[in-house]
């Protein structure tokens, strides 16, 4: 996010933090790294207006270590954040998975996000739900000609607007409109397939000079 001329990398908090009048929520569909979240809360001064669902799964050190084993890095092209292993524990319904309510440092920020958002909607106020990544890296997979995005070109979960509703705890009938955000130049983090990737040094130089250079957070 670029705000007031500054580049603000965010991985946990919603990009709506740039609006000082907004209340920020992280729904239970998000797996949370407490260290990164607390750092961003302090860095972007959102303490007092950000709340986290009590049942957000927690990324622990063991998840990050597992995510960085050679197979996951080279075959599945993971970014190594621990998101995948934490999501997998939730799907497998293991008893070892921790939730936000189990982390002492997160207790000041806990709430039932779905309940809060539905109350806000019933009062006629506006809610903007922010998803991550792009539709075509949903782990449901897509076919493009003879190529399939699954398994190397997908992320750990579905990334469509429908799943976003479930992630934040609201029903799809509450949604008035869905906004799709496009970038003029596509980018990708990781080593998976990337059709039409620009590798020509001269073209890349022009992109950088035009201010369109992008780096993963």
Predicted ranges, named:
Residues 1-217:
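Non-transmembrane, aqueous-exposed alpha-helical and coiled segments at domain scale
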């Amino acid at each position: 996010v670029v705000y007031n001329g500054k580049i603000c990398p965010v991985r946990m908090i919603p990009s709506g933090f740039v609006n000082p009048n907004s209340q920020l929520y992280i729904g239970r569909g998000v797996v949370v790294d407490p260290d990164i979240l607390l750092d961003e809360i302090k860095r972007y001064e959102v303490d007092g207006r950000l709340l986290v669902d009590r049942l957000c799964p927690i990324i622990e050190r063991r998840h990050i270590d597992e995510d960085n084993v050679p197979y996951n890095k080279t075959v599945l092209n993971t970014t190594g954040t621990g998101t995948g292993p934490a999501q997998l524990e939730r799907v497998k319904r293991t008893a070892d998975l921790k939730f936000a309510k189990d982390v002492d440092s997160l207790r000041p920020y806990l709430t039932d996000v779905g309940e809060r958002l539905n109350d806000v909607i019933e009062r006629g106020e506006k809610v903007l739900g922010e998803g991550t990544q792009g539709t075509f890296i949903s782990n449901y997979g897509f076919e493009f000609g003879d190529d399939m995005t699954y398994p190397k070109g997908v992320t750990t979960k579905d990334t469509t607007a429908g799943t976003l509703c479930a992630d934040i705890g609201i029903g799809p009938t509450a949604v008035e409109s869905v906004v799709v955000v496009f970038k003029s130049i596509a980018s990708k983090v990781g080593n998976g397939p990337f059709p039409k990737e620009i590798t020509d040094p001269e073209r890349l130089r022009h992109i950088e000079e035009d201010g369109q250079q992008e780096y993963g957070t």
